[in-house]
């Protein structure tokens, strides 16, 4: 389990594509690069991936099975991604822990500023939304938060302003796709 708390923001510097897979080269933020090695398991935009190569200041991940259920196929060089390294054995994860098993993607419906930060309204596909309720935790691009409001398949999440500095949520806009992990599945 991961915490669902983004530890840093990486930048995609290279993407190599083949017929059914991709290799993404990501530049890590200072201080986080030293914490990974080949075979480190981590979240990249909420999806559990394994480091396959480190070359210079670049960390590489192979993406194959996740292409059909995530936003990776639409990412391009220069895009920012949320990063979280798997906690060490025995560390407490807490509420809203993520597995990195992305169930699908959703579209940002609207972004509204408020006193505490901003609210993001996300249109969750009906198949993913059917068991969700207000106060359930959900993972969006690797950030675990409780749902504060829900109307049909539109959920509302409230983000604080301090997340702008450490995550890629500043790049969210209407109709942008995000990765979704449902936490209350049985």
Curated annotation (Swiss-Prot):
Naturally occurring in which organism (per UniProt): Photobacterium leiognathi
Gene responsible for this protein: lumP
Keywords attached to this entry: Luminescence, Repeat
Protein name: Lumazine protein
Note describing how the cofactor binds: Binds 1 6,7-dimethyl-8-(1'-D-ribityl)lumazine non-covalently.
Source organism superkingdom: Bacteria
PANTHER family given in the database record: RIBOFLAVIN SYNTHASE (PTHR21098:SF0), RIBOFLAVIN SYNTHASE ALPHA CHAIN (PTHR21098)
GO biological process, alphabetically ordered: bioluminescence; riboflavin biosynthetic process
MF annotations from Gene Ontology: riboflavin synthase activity
Lineage: Bacteria, Pseudomonadati, Pseudomonadota, Gammaproteobacteria, Vibrionales
SUPFAM superfamilies in the record: Riboflavin synthase domain-like
Repeat (Lumazine-binding) residue spans along the chain: 1-96, 97-186
């Amino acid at each position: 389990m991961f915490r669902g708390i983004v530890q840093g923001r990486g930048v995609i510097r290279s993407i190599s594509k083949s017929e059914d897979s991709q290799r993404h080269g990501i530049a890590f933020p200072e201080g986080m690069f030293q914490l990974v090695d080949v075979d480190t398991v981590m979240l990249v935009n909420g999806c559990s991936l394994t480091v396959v190569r480190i070359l210079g200041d670049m960390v590489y991940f192979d993406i194959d099975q996740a292409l059909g259920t995530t936003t990776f196929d639409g990412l391009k060089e220069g895009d920012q991604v949320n990063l979280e390294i798997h906690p060490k054995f025995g560390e407490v994860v807490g509420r809203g822990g993520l597995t990195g098993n992305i169930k699908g993607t959703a579209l940002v419906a609207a972004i509204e500023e408020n006193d505490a930060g901003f609210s993001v309204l996300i249109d969750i596909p009906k198949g993913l939304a059917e068991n969700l309720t207000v106060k359930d935790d959900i993972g969006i691009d690797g950030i675990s938060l409780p749902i504060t409001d829900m109307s049909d398949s539109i959920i509302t999440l409230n983000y604080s302003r301090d997340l702008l500095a450490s995550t890629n949520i500043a790049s969210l806009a209407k109709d942008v796709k995000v990765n979704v992990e449902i936490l209350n599945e049985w």
